[in-house]
């Protein structure tokens, strides 16, 4: 019966009646591109903040810059002497920093493809790196168990934080650059004041499983951690409380990159040691999609800054990057 034929009171009650909640929509990521160019295991993939490019690093000591939409190889950056574990973009997408087993970081100019600075000071493999939002500072983490803060302009180390008692697995600045989070094989996740270098808080899990990845949420209020017991957790770090736990994937050996997808609905995205990409609903913790196609461990998964696009990369038996897109 059409609403307009009902008595006014009845029609109004129908219009204002609370609706049953709709089923949460799920993503429908499908494979769009497969990018091949590295000759060894890929370690990291990152979209540029302007969304135009995708940077990949690998055990072949190379960085390749790809077109984010067409998958074409734009540039190859040469300079490191040993494998590269991580890359990170400056906020304006004009520069890139890389972390290598040769114990150095390199800052690259995107336009020319040339190395602008080599940052020396770590005494062991440099495993992770990040620019702060103004892109005047770089943070790095190393197997020497320290976190270092560098000045981009001069290439000088400004601070060395005796951060952990085991290798550092991940470092990340928050959205305004005031905080740094570090994760380590010692099982601790630490939040630092970027200006003073003071440790503000330490997060630890029961049993202290090695922390293999850490990242601030886009709004800076939460931290996503991965541990080598097949678990991702979302923390309210100001209270030291774990809010959400995401499981179902496999992660016991490698430091797998995870990411927040916020361009459509809100997902958590991670690689997995069963050769798949896993996508969880951020709120419900439900696995909403698994992306199949890689033939080795998916070490890295990155989300495009403005579109529903995921890039994933895999280890030695695969050596490819796959680009996936979804309607939501």
Curated annotation (Swiss-Prot):
Region described as Disordered: 1-25
Motif DDB1-binding motif: positions: 186-190
Pfam families linked to this entry: Beta-prop_WDR5
InterPro entries recorded: G-protein_beta_WD-40_rep, WD40/YVTN_repeat-like_dom_sf, WD40_repeat_CS, WD40_repeat_dom_sf, WD40_rpt
Repeat region (WD), residues: 37-76, 79-120, 122-162, 163-202, 206-247, 250-290, 293-328
Keywords: Repeat, Ubl conjugation pathway, WD repeat
Gene3D superfamilies from the UniProt entry: YVTN repeat-like/Quinoprotein amine dehydrogenase (2.130.10.10)
SUPFAM superfamilies reported for this sequence: WD40 repeat-like
CDD domains (UniProt xref): WD40
Domain of life assignment: Eukaryota
Assembly behavior: Probable part of a cullin-RING E3 protein ligase complex containing CUL4B-DDB1 and a substrate-recruiting component (DCAF). Interacts with CUL4B and DDB1.
Sequence similarity: Belongs to the WD repeat WDR5/wds family.
Its biological purpose: May function as a substrate receptor for CUL4-DDB1 ubiquitin E3 ligase complex.
Protein name per the record: WD repeat-containing protein 5B
Record organism: Mus musculus (Mouse)
